[in-house]
């Protein structure tokens, strides 16, 4: 620690001595800034640039020597796991001697692959991350936060001005709080808190000069805007009455006027200087991002600093200017392996490859090992390699294997179903898809003597009722994208998909119920296939047509 202090530049050392802390970075822009506060802000930006440059150099070195870096990451995971646990006991009860496996090849030969569901059930291994954790840990999470902030500042220089950012959810899109000695910069980054989303939204509404809007995930932000429309008058009355804070009757009038004009472009009407929306990418968020871009956040850029899974940060976003997420798989902890996925293959690949061995255009399932639960865990997240950064792959996330539909062996993958649903909604006049989830008919016992089928629950804007003709279009689109499904439908082995329109707030209630579950985890993935009857029945009770 003393060595680190000696290496810090004088600028950062002076910053640590300044009082008061940089809470002023998040004060409203109309607050009077003292000379000292202005100096603190400039120095905070300088310290952030230094820290990000330091992490960028580390990333360059690690990606130039990916094999060596992955070896070091594995050694760290083994050393950290050995401290509290001792020998690792697998799902079969067998004790695996992996702590002596100091090289990646020996480690992979000693420890078998297991699926995420098995990893969570291990008696001694525990879960990949504690379910109560609201932020990720490891070198990748720190890199994602520092490099993401630097990229955001470069692309949108005015975002990090005092009062320029507001987070409207209790969770943060930044994977990790800044550690000492950068803890004084925490107010640049939103950190999880106990505030209710309604209180956070009200705080943001009181600040018309916002430049960036933060939310834990896109689905959480979707719920925030849905709640804003439902409770807009209540929020306007609170602002006009000064509950909390000073009364802002003119701002309350602006809120009412903005809501009267409908959802499209609402964010820019409320915050005319808004430039970017920051959310954390995780499973099942693509649909929510598309809905936000088309409606409430129309005209705004979206940025995710990282892709997070249950084992931690697995991808870094170094390219905020790209509309669709491209993520670098870093060679540090957690230790990442890639399991080849072949389309139509009857048997799974027998062995994994390391990051430097990934081939462009190929698809792989992510396999993670971290110190919290020392398992070679198959996450089920499938990525496609689209490029390279030094010796490490740049990927896009394609689908989650655990979100496939399968009632007769047809195996409709998440991305295939999403394509079919998108085609169908495009044929429903005036409709915009907000959310969806599917249930296999056996879960709800809804076959009643007919062939097994899918129950599909959708939330829409612009369409209040679904005709039978529109409902049938989804089944036709499924047959277009999946020849196997078409064959089963022709033989009558699978019945037509049944589409149900649910009321406003149904998916918000679903996410709240999932978050309250003891096994919930961070980041909060959005399930597109529901496996539990009581969860599916919650949506079923909200069906409108």
Where are these regions (language model features)?
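Active-site glycine/GP-rich loop and adjacent strand/helix microenvironment
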Residues: 2-88, 93-95, 99, 107, ...
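Active-site diphosphate/adenylate-binding microenvironment
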Residues: 70-121, 127-132, 139-143, 147-158, ...
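Phosphate/oxyanion-binding active-site loops and adjacent basic polyanion-contact surfaces
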Residues: 115-121, 134-145, 190-197, 220, ...
């Amino acid at each position: 620690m003393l060595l680190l202090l000696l290496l810090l530049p004088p600028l950062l050392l002076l910053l640590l001595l300044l009082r008061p802390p940089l809470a002023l970075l998040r004060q409203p822009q109309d607050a009077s800034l003292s000379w000292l506060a202005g100096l603190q802000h400039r120095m905070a930006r300088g310290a952030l640039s230094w820290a990000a440059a330091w992490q960028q150099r580390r990333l360059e070195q690690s990606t130039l020597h990916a094999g060596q870096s992955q070896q070091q990451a594995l050694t760290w995971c083994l050393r950290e796991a050995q401290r509290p646990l001792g020998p690792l006991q697998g799902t079969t009860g067998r004790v695996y001697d992996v702590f002596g496996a100091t090289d990646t090849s020996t480690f992979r030969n000693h420890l078998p692959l297991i699926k995420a569901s098995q990893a969570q059930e291990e008696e001694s291994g525990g879960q990949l991350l504690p379910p109560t954790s609201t932020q990720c840990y490891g070198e990748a999470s720190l890199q994602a936060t520092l490099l993401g902030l630097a990229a955001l500042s470069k692309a949108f220089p005015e975002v990090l001005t005092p009062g320029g950012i507001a987070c409207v959810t209790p969770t943060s899109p930044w994977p990790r709080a800044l550690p000492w000695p950068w803890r004084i910069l925490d107010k640049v980054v939103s950190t999880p808190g106990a505030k209710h989303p309604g209180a956070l939204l009200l705080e943001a509404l009181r600040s018309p000069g916002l430049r960036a809007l933060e939310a834990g995930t896109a689905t959480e932000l979707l719920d925030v805007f849905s709640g804003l429309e439902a409770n807009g008058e209540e929020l306007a009355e609170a602002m006009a009455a000064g509950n909390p804070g000073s009364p802002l009757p003119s701002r309350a009038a602006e809120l009412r006027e903005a809501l009267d004009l409908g959802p499209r472009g609402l964010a820019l009407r409320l915050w005319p200087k808004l430039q970017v929306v920051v959310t954390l990418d995780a499973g099942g968020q693509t649909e929510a991002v598309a809905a936000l871009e088309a409606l409430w956040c129309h005209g705004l850029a979206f940025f995710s600093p990282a892709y997070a899974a249950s084992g931690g940060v697995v991808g870094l976003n170094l390219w905020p200017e790209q509309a669709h997420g491209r993520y670098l798989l870093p060679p540090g902890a957690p230790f990442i392996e890639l399991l080849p996925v072949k389309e139509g293959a009857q048997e799974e690949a027998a062995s994994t490859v390391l990051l430097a061995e990934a081939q462009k255009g190929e698809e792989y399932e992510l396999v993670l090992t971290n110190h919290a639960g020392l398992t070679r865990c198959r996450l089920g997240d499938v990525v496609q390699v689209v490029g390279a950064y030094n010796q490490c792959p740049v990927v896009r996330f394609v689908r989650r294997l655990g979100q496939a539909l399968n009632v007769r062996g047809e195996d409709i993958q998440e991305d295939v179903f999403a394509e079919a649903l998108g085609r169908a909604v495009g044929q429903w006049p005036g409709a915009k898809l907000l959310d969806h989830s599917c249930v296999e008919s056996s879960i709800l016992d809804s076959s009643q003597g007919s062939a097994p089928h899918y129950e599909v629950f959708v939330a829409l804007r612009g369409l209040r009722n679904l005709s039978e003709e529109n409902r049938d279009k989804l089944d036709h689109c499924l047959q277009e994208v999946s020849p196997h499904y078409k064959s089963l439908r022709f033989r009558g082995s699978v019945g037509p998909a049944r589409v149900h329109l649910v009321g406003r707030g149904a998916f918000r209630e679903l996410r709240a119920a999932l978050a309250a579950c003891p096994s919930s985890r961070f980041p909060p993935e959005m399930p597109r296939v529901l496996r539990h009857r009581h969860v599916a029945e919650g949506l079923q009770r909200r069906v409108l047509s």
